[in-house]
């Protein structure tokens, strides 16, 4: 005699999240933590690849690694990554690169948070996504923790539903202006 085991949606989310957090870290740790500048420019180094709740993500910098580079003035910079960092595959952001994502551990989310980042002149630079964070406050704190204390690139953070975010993520026309400026984002947030 066979028995049916019934689990609730809440229990399933917990099981999936626990498995996923472990798998994400394992995949993230496959990434080369010290690629050369040439390798970074060409994207020619080992990276981690994960699928988180339907999003295909490449992890460039695992939590605890250092992200470094050279700014426009030739000054070297380096920052320790407090969260896994990578990008959504098959996307194109305002800056001409893939849309970047920081990955938290709270994967039982129903919201995604999008940060609009500005350059030194205060002009829109790009949007960065905060995936797996409990609320807007923790998402903002997580974003800022991955930059130096004198970072001035944070402009705005917006909370949005997953279905709406998916629609925006794969519409290449949408990344031309800050996320928070979209009328449909404002309408969605006003309805909550």
Residue ranges: model-predicted function:
Residues 23-192:
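Hydrophobic N-terminal alpha-helices or hydrophobic patches in metabolic proteins across all domains
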Residues 1-26:
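Protein-protein interaction and targeting regions used for scaffolding, dimerization, and localization
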């Amino acid at each position: 005699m066979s028995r049916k085991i019934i689990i609730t949606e809440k229990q399933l989310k917990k099981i999936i999240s626990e498995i996923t957090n472990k798998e994400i870290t394992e995949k993230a740790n496959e990434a080369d933590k010290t690629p050369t500048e040439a390798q970074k420019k060409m994207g020619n180094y080992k990276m981690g690849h994960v699928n988180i709740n339907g999003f295909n993500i490449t992890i460039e910098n695992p939590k605890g690694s250092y992200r470094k580079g050279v700014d426009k003035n030739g000054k070297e910079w380096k920052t320790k990554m407090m969260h896994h960092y990578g990008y959504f595959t098959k996307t194109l952001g305002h800056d001409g690169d893939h849309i970047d994502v920081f990955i938290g551990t709270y994967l039982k989310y129903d919201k995604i948070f999008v940060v609009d980042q500005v350059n030194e002149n205060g002009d829109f630079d790009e949007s960065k996504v905060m995936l797996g964070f409990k609320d807007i406050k923790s998402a903002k704190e997580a974003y800022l923790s991955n930059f130096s204390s004198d970072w001035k690139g944070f402009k705005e953070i917006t909370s949005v539903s997953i279905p709406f975010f998916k629609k925006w993520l794969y519409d290449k026309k949408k990344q031309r202006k800050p996320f928070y400026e979209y009328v449909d984002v404002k309408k969605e947030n006003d309805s909550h």
